């Protein structure tokens, strides 16, 4: 109740009012006022999604007419600058269902989905889209029939739920539990393998016998035996004897490296080495034992195909 007409009009102009986030309907005081008059509410609605070519007063009025009774249109073709949405004040019945989307086909066959946004709307029934009650107390919602469940059925359902939960947990923790014959398709046969290339005897000889010619060995049809090999070491200050093992054939020609004496055979030993600085008288010393050893070494070199000195010219 208010005594001033200005305040009364201000209250009516600023509705709808809210109490505990629910709409409150208002009506101007009249004599013999009854509750049957409080059956409507006025809301501001924003219409969005109208194509730019059809944004005008005529289009807004035609679309808003489908919602309810139009009270005020807050749009003018000559003065309005914003066209993102059009505001219109509409009177709804308190039991009417609110509409939030509508598909409209225009004259040239262009279709558009128009959305409606209600200002100050806080609560609404998500089942019937009415603004008078909550979903939990909706009288228009169909009540789902309750099935009578016995104790044995309830226990069986609980066991099945526990089993499925454990199975899902086990599957997530161990990916191999999901493998079965129906989980994966049949694998494709692998392509045929390319045969290995034949062995090259020259490369094998170079790897196993670095000081022997490849032509002196037979053609290898399989892998060679693993024989430990050592390189010949011939140094002046070293006492290591050259290796002569079973890998070197007796009839194979012997290779002589640069700086190696041709008189030194495979099975001979270096005796009586002459060091630098010795006198000529000491070189001729040795006795009959030295001569016998020299004669044997010459015979061994002759048998092994060693190089002999040519006779002296007279």
UniProtKB/Swiss-Prot annotation:
Name of one Pfam family that matches: zf-CCHC_4
Comp. bias regions, Polar residues: 261-272
Tree of life domain: Eukaryota
Low complexity: bias regions: 171-186
Biased segments, Basic and acidic residues type: 289-303
Stretches with biased composition (Pro residues): 187-200
Region annotated Disordered, chain positions: 170-203, 258-314
Protein name stated in the entry: Uncharacterized protein At4g02000
């Amino acid at each position: 109740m208010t005594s001033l007409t200005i305040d009364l009009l201000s209250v009516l102009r600023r509705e709808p009012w809210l109490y505990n986030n629910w709409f409150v309907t208002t009506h101007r005081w009249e004599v013999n006022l009854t509750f049957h008059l409080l059956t409507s509410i006025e809301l501001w609605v924003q219409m969005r999604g109208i194509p730019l070519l059809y944004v005008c007063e005529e289009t807004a009025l035609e679309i808003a007419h489908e919602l309810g009774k139009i009270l005020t249109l807050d749009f003018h073709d000559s003065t309005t600058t914003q066209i993102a949405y059009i505001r219109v004040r509409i009177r709804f019945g308190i039991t009417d269902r609110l509409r939030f989307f509508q598909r409209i086909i225009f004259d040239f066959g262009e279709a558009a989905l128009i959305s409606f946004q209600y200002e100050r709307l806080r609560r609404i029934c998500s089942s019937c889209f009415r603004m008078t009650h909550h979903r939990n107390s909706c009288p228009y919602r169909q009540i789902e029939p309750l099935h009578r469940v016995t104790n044995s059925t309830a226990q069986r359902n609980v066991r099945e739920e526990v089993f499925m939960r454990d199975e899902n947990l086990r599957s997530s923790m161990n990916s191999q539990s999901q493998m079965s014959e129906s989980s994966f398709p049949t694998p494709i046969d692998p392509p045929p393998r390319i045969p290995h290339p034949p062995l090259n005897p020259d490369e094998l000889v170079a790897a196993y016998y670095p000081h022997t010619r490849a032509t002196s060995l037979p053609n290898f049809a399989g892998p060679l035996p693993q024989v430990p090999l050592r390189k010949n070491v011939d140094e002046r200050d070293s006492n290591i004897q050259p290796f002569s093992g079973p890998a070197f054939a007796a009839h194979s020609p012997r290779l002589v490296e640069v700086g190696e004496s041709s008189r030194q055979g495979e099975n001979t030993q270096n005796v009586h080495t002459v060091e630098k600085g010795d006198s000529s008288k000491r070189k001729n010393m040795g006795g009959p034992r030295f001569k016998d050893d020299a004669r044997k070494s010459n015979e061994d070199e002759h048998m092994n195909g060693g190089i002999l000195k040519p006779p002296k010219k007279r």
